[in-house]
Amino acid sequence: MTTQRLGQAVVIGAVMIFGLTYGLSAPLISLRLHTEGYDEWFIGLNAAMHAVGVFAVAPFLPALCQRYTPGALITRSLFAILVLLCLFPFVPLLGWFALRFLLGVFSEIILVVTETWLNHTTVEQARAKTLALYTASLSLGYAIGPLLLLIAPGDIPFYLGGGLALLSAVILWTSAPPSPPLAEDKVSGILRYVWMAPLAMAATALNAALEAAGLNLLVVYAMQMGWSEQAATELLAVLMVGAIVLQLPVGWLADKYDRHKLLLGCAALSTVGALLWPLALNVPILAWLLMFFWGGVFVAIYTLIITQVGSRFTGAHLAGVYAAMSIMWGVGALIGPSLGGIAMSAFTHGLPYLAALLCGLFFLWALWVHKRENGGA
């Protein structure tokens, strides 16, 4: 294995373990607050502090990527997360707002720097496969993390999460090849990066909005369609499995064929697929198949976008675009559940209609951008 591939493998492995840490800690904190008797609005406000941390650190990420090596940024952030998680059992519950804010800051550093680092070290011919593996590994960690709550009672999950962060840091520190700071580019303001990559911003907001709405409301929608709570939860799990597994073949295709045409195809299939939800949910096997493929095709929009961004930008500018994308992710995640709730209140099939509408609008936007960049061809 070449030094370059070893570095990529180490980063992807460390990111999957970080995904476990995040997937464990997010529901853990909410459950502990619920157990202590706090209302949903308080729990939601605490969860929003993670997004506030993301918004706060994003403008500084391009400069950080210039000043420090990616390995140093990631390992120090992982050590910070270790300390923060171990502090939760000893800090008064109101102090958890500050801890959650700092978790958002250091988690954002890890995600932006790893995406930038992988793009910086991969060759163009394998860029999509590498980033598809990254997306799948991170998603796998997110999915498995909550399951660890079933085997660890009390305060143990906080220490378990800290231990996973430590493991990830040690793997990265001892195994990753040395790398210099990512670039010497002149850093631009964060808003400039929004205008430099408008399609990437739209794709990120779309993915975050529907992911947040789906995770919160898909089970409710399926139950309204006559599914039991267990069966509806299994349907959500099938969607998540598809979102993980299908990224690898999408990455393979994206390294061989026109990535923008694949993006348009995924957006079109996501639009049509969402419109089929009401029909498919009447036949369980069709619903499982549809959700499996829809989850994979929809998440592929994000995989293809981060690949396109990596092909177009380098160094601090790449980190800047990813930082701007993370802000759009936060915006999408904040408004997605609200839009979903309003849509479901207005229409029986409001959730799939909303998904189809947003995917359709993104398809039209991507088509317009493609024609503009190709001189109307």
Report residues per predicted region:
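Helix-loop boundary and gating motifs at the non-cytosolic
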Residues: 2-51, 197-203, 211-225, 232
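Helix-to-loop junctions at the C-terminal end of transmembrane segments
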Residues: 57-69, 246-258, 344
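Structural signature of the two symmetry-related core transmembrane helices
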Residues: 72-86, 261-276, 356
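Cytoplasmic helix-loop-helix junction between adjacent transmembrane helices
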Residues: 101-136
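Intracellular juxtamembrane helix-capping segments at the cytosolic ends
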Residues: 109-122, 299-313
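C-terminal membrane-cytosol helix-exit motif in multi-pass small-molecule transporters
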Residues: 162-182, 365-370
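C-terminal transmembrane helical hairpin of 12-TM major facilitator-type secondary transporters
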Residues: 260-303
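A late C-terminal transmembrane helix in Major Facilitator Superfamily
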Residues: 316-345
